[in-house]
């Protein structure tokens, strides 16, 4: 069918209306690229599919695809051996979980023994439940990987907690003891990824350590006491190991996808 005929029939206006009804970006893209068939057998088959789809909708209600993210770019990256990030893996897990819900929309679930033209389409769906479950087990949210994602990550994070506790114990003893009178506030703060104390500038020589920052007025120096320099170094090294372990976890999940 030529473009002139399509315009005369206002075909693209119909496509625009259909596209607005699609709840996912991938669905919208499919709608935009639909073209009418000129094959009478294909037309009859698609009409049968439309009728069967309406029957399912009337019997069981609508299927939601609104939560589905566009993962086509991620799948292309996997094809060339790239590893995916947290948000990409969560999007794939969400798609697979939605696939599982859609598959439950089968003929047997409707309690209807009659076969229809959509059965094969639903039966071909593979939710890959073990993969989505593993992604959810390892990734808690966009910003957090579970401690249980790997034995290595759990070990590193336990070591980080021990190091953090030791640093806070050392600094608390200074805040409540020998450095008490030299501090602007009795708080432990962080500067450049290092735990520091807010020392009054005039008492700089009374607190041995490294200056990492100062207040806008210059009245407060943020000093990392010598007593915690090695502990801070250990903590930073553990932080690097944590990042490496997380990258390894994401690599492993990407290989499974």
Protein language model features and the residues they cover:
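SMC-family hinge/dimerization module
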Residues: 187, 191-222, 232
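Internal alpha/beta scaffold segment
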Residues: 226-252
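A short alpha->loop->secondary-structure connector
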Residues: 110-114, 214-218, 239
